[in-house]
């Protein structure tokens, strides 16, 4: 992977860092391998405060070790955006099906680079059949798969963690080569390795989270999302404000909502979206 990055792009590997346990494993692996690498984090604007702090703390440590780190802030149509300003622009809430937030808030980093991700098959049932190598393109008809298992699906690097993720992937549309070194690791492998390395992890793992990600992510279960909003009520308020602006924008665009009258109506509908395993969720009990 490192040789490919240097020969193909003339740049070191770029490790995409989310602030979660899998990203921490990838950093430890890169350190131990002694390869040149850089680290990038996509600031989604909807991550929990603990995650934001953990990322910045990790980057300070890495910079002291001589590792170049960069935080990428999201833009849409040439303008800086947040989750809250993006929703009115899109005239709809982000859902499990319409995951525009992933594309705008997470997918911009790593263009024209060979990237390392912490994608794992064990993170969800749907990831279980990912293979070894694939080329990812904007059009399904242009896709080339270097694997025994056929596939015709498009990929989203940071959130499309379905069963067909590979160890090595190439995205022609975004100019990315994606390397997933822990694709076959189990949860036990991850936690065991982090303990062995004495790695400082995101404090949310000590507070009842089994995974970390955007607060309110529609890929999480309804019960867990409500628990997240109990912990972070200001995020709920920001979603409500964004939904209110969205309804106003829909009227201005000549597309008034038919199923919602208020921001609360939108929020209640949005929270009923059912769960897909593999994203932010809480355990049964919170400990802090």
Model feature map: region roles:
Residues 1-288:
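Nucleotide-activated chemistry modules centered on ATP-dependent adenylation/adenylyltransferase
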């Amino acid at each position: 992977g490192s040789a490919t990055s240097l020969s193909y792009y003339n740049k070191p590997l770029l490790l995409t860092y989310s602030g979660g346990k899998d990203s921490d494993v990838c950093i430890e692996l890169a350190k131990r391998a002694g390869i040149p690498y850089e680290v990038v984090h996509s600031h989604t604007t909807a991550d929990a405060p603990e995650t934001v702090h953990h990322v910045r703390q990790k980057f300070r440590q890495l910079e002291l070790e001589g590792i170049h780190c960069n935080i990428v802030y999201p833009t849409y149509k040439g303008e800086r955006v947040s989750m809250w300003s993006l929703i009115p622009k899109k005239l709809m809430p982000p859902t499990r099906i319409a995951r525009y937030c992933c594309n705008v808030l997470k997918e911009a980093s790593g263009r024209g680079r060979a990237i390392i991700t912490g994608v794992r098959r064990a993170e969800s049932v749907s990831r279980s059949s990912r293979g070894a190598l694939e080329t990812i393109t904007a059009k399904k008809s242009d896709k080339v798969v270097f694997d025994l298992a056929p596939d015709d699906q498009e990929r989203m690097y940071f959130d499309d963690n379905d069963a067909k993720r590979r160890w090595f992937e190439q995205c022609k549309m975004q100019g990315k080569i994606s390397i997933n070194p822990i694709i076959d690791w189990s949860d036990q492998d991850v936690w065991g390795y982090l303990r062995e390395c004495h790695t400082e992890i995101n404090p949310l793992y000590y507070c009842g989270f089994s995974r970390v990600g955007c607060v309110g992510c529609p890929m999480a279960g309804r019960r867990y999302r409500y628990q997240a909003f109990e912990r972070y009520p200001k995020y709920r308020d920001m979603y409500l404000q964004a939904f209110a602006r969205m309804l106003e924008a829909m009227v201005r665009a000549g597309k008034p909502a038919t199923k919602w009258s208020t921001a609360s109506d939108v929020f209640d509908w949005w929270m009923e979206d059912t769960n897909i395993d593999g994203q932010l969720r809480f355990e049964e009990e919170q400990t802090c």
